[in-house]
């Protein structure tokens, strides 16, 4: 609210400079021209601040129009904002690839995820969670699943022979998601040790979730994981294998960034990455085409330093 209040104050100051003092001038004198002048005035502000202030003043124009105090063309306001204002810079998605690869290496041996306890029932729950967590994280890394998509995945969605699943993804659209051999193998191992629970569920296997809850609330029932559970799994295993400082920096969505970046580095093909990540807009995929400092250093060395006579021996 403070940002909107500040935006309106700056607008009033701009009007005064244009000899249109809000305290003494009838509101009927206000036109889209003054909005355009305000956009020009905001060029000295940061793009993010500019957008906040423009939204505030645009809202005021629309309110005045609704109250029939002035006549405003909404389409004209939109055109002015689009043509003359600046957009805030887009942050490059951060993909800590090395950290994720370290994590994936650590969980390759499922025994690393299992802690020993004397109680047989607790030990079975720990084992189930270990196999599930490994399969879940490998699936995120190798498929580009959004966390809610992975949680909704059912056994009947899978084509085990061909290594893919057919899902209803973002925008309620049907999509094919491909699996690696390692992620498929991890899922099969997890489902194998879960077989008794699945068989006693009283439901058709095809209707059961791939990734199930294994907590007190679920008991021996097969209930699908929630996105919150998915995020908790990643947090727990990141802390276990990488340390507390990376908790929150590596999330289920970070695995999706890793997936897209891996495709681009492996193929250099933007269209492949877009299709496999199921991005509607290729501009989203383009955000992942940045190079790391290591890659730039290597390219620079190859061009300028590799055969240089000036290089120290």
Predicted region positions:
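Conserved catalytic core of the tyrosine transesterase superfamily
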Residues: 1-313
């Amino acid at each position: 609210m403070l940002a909107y209040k500040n935006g309106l104050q700056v607008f009033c100051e701009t009007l005064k400079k244009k000899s249109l003092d809000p305290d003494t001038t009838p509101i009927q004198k206000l036109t889209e021209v003054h909005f355009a002048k305000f956009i020009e005035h905001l060029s000295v502000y940061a793009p993010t601040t500019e957008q906040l202030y423009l939204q505030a003043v645009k809202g005021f124009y629309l309110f005045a129009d609704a109250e029939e105090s002035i006549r405003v063309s909404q389409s004209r306001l939109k055109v002015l904002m689009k043509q003359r204002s600046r957009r805030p810079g887009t942050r490059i998605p951060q993909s800590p690839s090395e950290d994720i690869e370290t994590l994936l290496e650590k969980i390759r041996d499922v025994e690393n995820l299992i802690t020993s306890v004397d109680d047989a029932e607790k030990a079975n729950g720990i084992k189930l969670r270990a196999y599930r967590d490994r399969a879940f994280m490998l699936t995120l890394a190798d498929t580009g699943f959004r966390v809610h998509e992975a949680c909704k995945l059912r056994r009947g969605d899978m084509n085990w022979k061909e290594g893919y699943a057919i899902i209803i993804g973002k925008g309620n659209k049907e999509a094919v998601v491909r699996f690696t051999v390692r992620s498929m193998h991890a899922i099969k191992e997890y489902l194998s040790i879960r077989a008794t629970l699945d068989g006693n569920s009283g439901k058709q296997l095809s209707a059961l979730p791939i990734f199930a809850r294994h907590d007190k609330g679920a008991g021996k029932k097969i209930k699908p994981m929630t996105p919150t559970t998915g995020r908790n799994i990643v947090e727990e295993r990141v802390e276990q294998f990488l340390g507390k400082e990376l908790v929150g920096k590596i999330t289920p969505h970070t695995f999706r960034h890793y997936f897209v970046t891996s495709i681009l580095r492996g193929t250099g093909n933007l269209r492949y990455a877009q299709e496999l990540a199921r991005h509607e807009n290729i501009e989203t995929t383009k955000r992942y085409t940045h190079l790391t400092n290591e890659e730039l250093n290597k390219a620079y060395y190859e061009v300028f330093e590799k055969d240089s006579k000036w290089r120290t021996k």
